[in-house]
Regions:
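Basic, Gly/Ser/Thr-rich N-terminal segments that form RNA-phosphate-binding interfaces in CRISPR RAMP
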Residues: 1-294
Length: 294
């Protein structure tokens, strides 16, 4: 076994600024304060770092700066993010997968218009051309993920808002599966999401959903999009540019589910999959974002 084999995962080029990450990304464009692109071998491949740390580097915020100049500078920054190809991140993709026997998983693929998550995170300088809203990235790999807390929240909201819907799913499973009849939905909710009546070691755990594949031929997985709020009918609406995950990107939803309580771990997994396909996840689901298919 070599010294490389003995290194922990965080020494294998997964953190922003690590040597192996730099080597893989020598030709990535970076915009200086003049708006020109330059090749810099110190640019990390960590997209989260690009979005939250490097994004405003080199932008001259001073009185008299023209809107058109800001737009040109941010266009270069935006392109450096949206032209990233998923095939350039094999180590990061492998690190996010949890291939253990104790993990239950299923994979779903984004549909048009895509997925947005983390919009509430601050990301704005009130200048022309920038991405105005936040986005959620895994801190270590820099790839988009759906936090386990968000997955848990969406699933629980289905129990709270529509117990009859949950009851219907349990009583009407896909073909060749056994219906679950006469179950207390309120008790099932508390058992799954609060661990009520269960030992801490026997409670269900909701893990981050991670990207495993991209279905686009060019391996792109991020893109710009716009929303146009109408806060006042007498004012012209101002489009807001934001970042999204493209359609045809496959996410793996991962859980550590226990065979304890009212239904089995396999029953919970199948239930969760049907809920997510029906309701979607992330921001702007009311206008079509966050929808998935098998």
């Amino acid at each position: 076994m070599t010294d490389q084999d003995n290194k922990p995962k965080n020494d294998l080029g997964l953190f922003a600024g690590s040597n192996r990450t730099k080597e893989r990304d020598r030709t990535a464009p970076r915009a200086d304060h003049t708006g020109k692109k330059e090749n810099m071998n110190v640019l990390p491949a960590n997209i989260g770092w690009l979005y939250y740390k490097d994004y405003y580097h080199g932008i001259p915020f001073h009185p008299g700066q023209k809107k058109e100049e800001f737009k040109t500078l941010f266009e270069a920054k935006n392109q450096a993010i949206t032209t990233r190809q998923l095939s350039r991140y094999p180590e990061e993709l492998a690190a996010l997968k949890l291939d253990y026997q104790s993990i239950q998983r299923f994979e779903l693929t984004t549909e048009y218009p895509g997925l947005v998550t983390g919009l509430g995170n601050p990301h704005e300088s009130h200048q022309e051309g920038e991405y105005k809203l936040g986005f959620y990235f895994d801190h270590t790999t820099g790839l988009p993920v759906i936090p386990g807390s968000s997955v848990k929240g969406v699933l629980r909201s289905a129990f709270k808002k529509s117990p009859d819907y949950i009851k219907y799913l349990l009583e009407n499973p896909p073909e060749k599966e056994t219906p679950i009849i006469d179950i207390d939905i309120n008790q099932l909710e508390k058992e799954i999401f609060d661990g009520e009546g269960l030992s801490p070691y026997k409670r269900d755990i909701f893990l981050d959903a991670v990207i495993v594949a991209g279905g686009n031929t060019n391996q792109l997985f991020l893109a710009a999009d716009f929303i146009t709020p109408h806060p006042d009918e007498f004012k012209d609406p101002v489009p807001l540019q934001f970042l999204k995950v493209l359609p045809q990107v496959t996410f793996r939803f991962q859980f550590r589910l226990k065979n304890e309580g009212l239904i089995s771990s396999e029953g919970k997994k199948r239930l969760f999959e049907r809920i997510l396909k029906d309701l979607g996840i992330g921001a702007k689901t009311n206008v079509g974002y966050g929808k998935f298919k098998e």
